[in-house]
Amino acid sequence: MHASEPSEDETLDSLIGDWKIFQLRRGHRFSTDDLVCAWRASMASPRGRRLLDMGSGIGSVGLATLHRMDPEASLVTIEAQEISISLARRSVAVNGLVDRISLHHGDLRDPGVLAEGAAFDVITGSPPYIPEGKGVMSPVPQRAGARMELRGSVYDYCAAARRWLAPGGRFTFVMAAQDPRTEDAPAANGLAVVERWDYVFSAGREPHIATLVTARVEDNPPPRRSGTLVVRGPDGRWTDDYLAFRREMGSPNPLKG
């Protein structure tokens, strides 16, 4: 098998625009969570040049964010799971992005994983939502690491973002909407929420996930804004707003609904 082609256990899928991504057939795969995180991050900092994606997994959030930035923008990623960073490395190569993306195999909780003095205009993260011991552990290690808090929680993501966020920069993350830690973690780490979007997966239900855009408190951030996106309407079909979001992102529309 050539490195640019998927094995029997992998797929090579469209992510955004003409960029593609390698994924395991039965592993962790990119989702709406990743796309909305990239969407709000790029909207918050459209002229960002130095991007960091923490806990980057297979690279979906970082790639989708970078795609929406100017060609001069560059991306650094941090990922602990070897299988995920290996897939991301191949995605970088197949998209011709080797000169724009630097992949780091390590733990985002370790300040030494990046060079001293590293600072970024745009930071993204998709923390796992489930505390260890509170849910059923996936038998697939890659999935387990993406869903369970095996290497820290949203508090660790916010602490790391605070460490590497440049003055005037923005940290955007996606998290469970109903979890009180979603709001508490930024505040506990000197970050102010400047925007929150909630995502209702089925009309009439509570929001399932939320994206928060944050800034350093000492940067005198602007007043907080909010928004809501409903994914499926009362009839179970994709809403016009959701399909418009997919078009704006340059991401293929869902196949069903």
Question: What is each PLM-predicted segment?
Answer:
Residues 30, 151-208:
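Conserved Class I SAM-dependent methyltransferase catalytic core
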Residues 48-55:
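Conserved class I S-adenosyl-L-methionine
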Residues 58-72:
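Conserved SAM-binding loop of SAM-dependent methyltransferases across substrates and taxa
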Residues 74-79:
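Conserved SAM-binding motif I beta-strand of class I
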Residues 88-89:
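Conserved SAM-binding loop
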Residues 113-123:
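A short acidic, Gly/Pro-enriched loop at the edge of an enzyme's catalytic core
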Residues 127-156:
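Mobile active-site "lid"/loop adjacent to the S-adenosyl-L-methionine
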Residues 206-257:
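SAM/dcSAM-binding transferase cores
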